[in-house]
């Protein structure tokens, strides 16, 4: 989260706003940045978009590397993969940064699916949209591996696909670090 909060500070500084309250800065973690700049610092739409550009200016080169993994997460992911579980990442970080982050932390080999948010204007900007895309990709992955799911998903019956999605959700474990996850 340090990469995010420092990049938010950088963006605000570029707009002449000083913010040192860590609690305020941490509120930016998760929701779309343009919405957060408007909500937490009262920026106009135009200034919020400028702030997002400033944020990314710093984040893409520096902030992306100022984060850390939770203790034991590599071992957990390795164990889950060895046990044959499908592992997926749903993050509100823009999808364009996801491969770099996974590679930097040397964990890309542990994920079957990794989905991030889309940039401004994209349909997938909130965490629930990202999670739904993960489930859609799990369905596709299962279709390739499981004839029963393939047969049910290939029908035009929406309730069959909904049943499959409910089964996948029931068998899923999600780990998050905030109430938004």
Where are the predicted features?
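Helix-loop "lid/cap" segments that line or gate small-molecule binding pockets
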Residues: 11-12, 32-45, 101, 130, ...
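Substrate-recognition "cap/lid" segment bordering the active-site pocket of phosphatases
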Residues: 95-146, 160-173, 179-180
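Short beta-strand immediately N-terminal to the catalytic nucleophile in serine-hydrolase-like folds
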Residues: 90, 175-176
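Short, acidic loop-to-helix structural element flanking the phosphoryl-transfer center
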Residues: 61-89, 95-99, 128
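Active-site neighborhood of HAD-like aspartate-dependent phosphohydrolases
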Residues: 1-27, 41
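A metal-dependent, Asp-based hydrolase signature
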Residues: 27-61, 71-79
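Conserved donor sugar-nucleotide recognition element shared by glycan-biosynthetic enzymes
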Residues: 4, 33, 69, 124-127
């Amino acid at each position: 989260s340090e990469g995010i909060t420092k990049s938010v500070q950088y963006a605000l500084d570029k707009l002449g706003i000083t913010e040192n309250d860590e609690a305020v800065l941490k509120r930016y973690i998760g929701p779309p940045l343009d919405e957060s700049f408007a909500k937490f610092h009262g920026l106009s739409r135009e200034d919020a978009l400028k702030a997002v550009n400033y944020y990314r200016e710093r984040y893409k080169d520096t902030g992306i590397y100022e984060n850390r993994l939770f203790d034991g997460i590599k071992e957990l992911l390795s164990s889950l993969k060895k046990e044959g579980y499908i592992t997926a990442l749903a993050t509100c970080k823009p999808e364009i940064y996801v491969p770099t982050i996974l590679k930097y932390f040397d964990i890309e080999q542990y994920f079957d699916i990794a989905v991030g948010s889309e940039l401004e204007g994209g349909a997938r900007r909130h965490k629930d949209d990202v999670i739904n895309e993960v489930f859609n990709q799990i369905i596709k992955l299962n279709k390739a591996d499981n004839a029963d799911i393939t047969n049910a998903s290939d029908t035009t019956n929406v309730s069959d696909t909904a049943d499959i999605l409910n089964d996948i959700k029931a068998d899923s474990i999600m780990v998050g670090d905030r109430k938004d996850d």
